[in-house]
Amino acid sequence: MDVLRLLTWATLMTWVTLITLCSSAYAAGRAENRFGTIHVDGRKTGTVHYTIEYGEKGDVETLRTRASLSILGIKLFNFEQNLHEEWRGGGLRLMRSRTEDDGTHYSASLNRGPEKYKGVVNDKPIELPGHAFPASVWHYNVVRQSLLFDLMTLKPMNVRIARSDETMTVNNKTLAVERFDFTGDWKATVWFDQKRQLVKFEYPVPGHTVTIQLDD
């Protein structure tokens, strides 16, 4: 069960979300749908579908993502998360989340103050430095941070990031991508295309490698 819970946290906390935010500009009044697959140790075990909706000013308003994971047709666990974020000027101002992690429930809230974040996780107060950033791989700015925090528990995570250029084949197309390797308290590798859209996310857990590959 420990491995399954790590798989849940590693692969799905970022994906099974309902997010409201204001960030980068796109064409107004449209929605995008993207699909991908989840692999564990190279074997396909699940799927990902997320929809981005844009407001009248072209800002991202909502990001809805659903994912499932099973082996041999058996559902391994249940993970659901509703997450609300508000961003201004490229910075997170507040966040609210409710998560069910295979029967364990988390309720978290976070507000940005003048110098730090103040929040609550399951009725326990917490504080985070003002420069902490959510561990959300859909957001390109995650690669510019040294202090992240867990979206479910709000636990701070110190990271180091190394960047490199690569090419990747997706649906028989060769893409130029940026690769970012996270080490420290959070170990992951993330690939973005030239439009700074997420292409691939890989995360090691004890004895396994979990990969999420988005379709073109």
Predicted regions located by residue number:
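Bacterial N-terminal signal peptides
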Residues: 9-22
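Short, aromatic- and cysteine-enriched interfacial helices/patches
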Residues: 3, 69-77, 148-152
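Short, acidic, Ser/Thr-enriched surface-loop or helix-capping motifs
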Residues: 39, 169, 193
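Boundary at the C-terminal end of the N-terminal hydrophobic targeting segment
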Residues: 22-29
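N-terminal secretory signal peptides that target proteins for export/translocation
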Residues: 1-8
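Low-complexity, intrinsically disordered Gly/Pro/Thr-rich segments
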Residues: 186-188, 192-202
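Solvent-exposed helix/loop surface patches that form functional interfaces
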Residues: 29-32, 96-177, 181-183, 202, ...
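N-terminal mature ectodomain segment of secretory-pathway/periplasmic proteins
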Residues: 30-34, 38-113, 196, 203
